């Protein structure tokens, strides 16, 4: 299939709050979840990116600032300082 069908985020229904909470924990295991973080459309795009780029996995973010922040925060701790060039994406410096 070239394009998987689009799955609307509002169609993900949980029987209990506990079931919804468990789905949120298991997002890395392709468990259906509400929003951009766990629909079949989302998982198909991740799989395509892994195949195209030859990667081991793929994380999707709603914007560039979120992606940059996650990359930086995975290496620094509270109180750390980082050096960056003046030409970096402006919101990152803030």
PLM feature segments, named:
Residues 1-23:
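N-terminal amphipathic/basic leader segments beginning at the initiator methionine
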Residues 10-11, 63-64, 85-87:
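Fold-independent oxyanion-binding glycine-rich loops
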């Amino acid at each position: 299939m070239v394009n998987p069908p689009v799955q609307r985020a509002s169609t993900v229904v949980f029987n209990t709050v506990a079931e919804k909470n468990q789905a949120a924990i298991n997002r890395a295991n392709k468990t259906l979840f509400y929003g951009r973080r766990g629909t079949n459309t989302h998982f198909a795009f991740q799989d395509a990116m892994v195949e195209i780029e030859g990667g081991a996995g793929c994380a999707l973010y709603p914007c560039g600032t979120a992606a940059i922040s996650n990359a930086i925060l995975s290496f620094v701790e509270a109180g750390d300082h980082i050096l960056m060039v003046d030409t970096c994406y402006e919101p990152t410096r803030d």
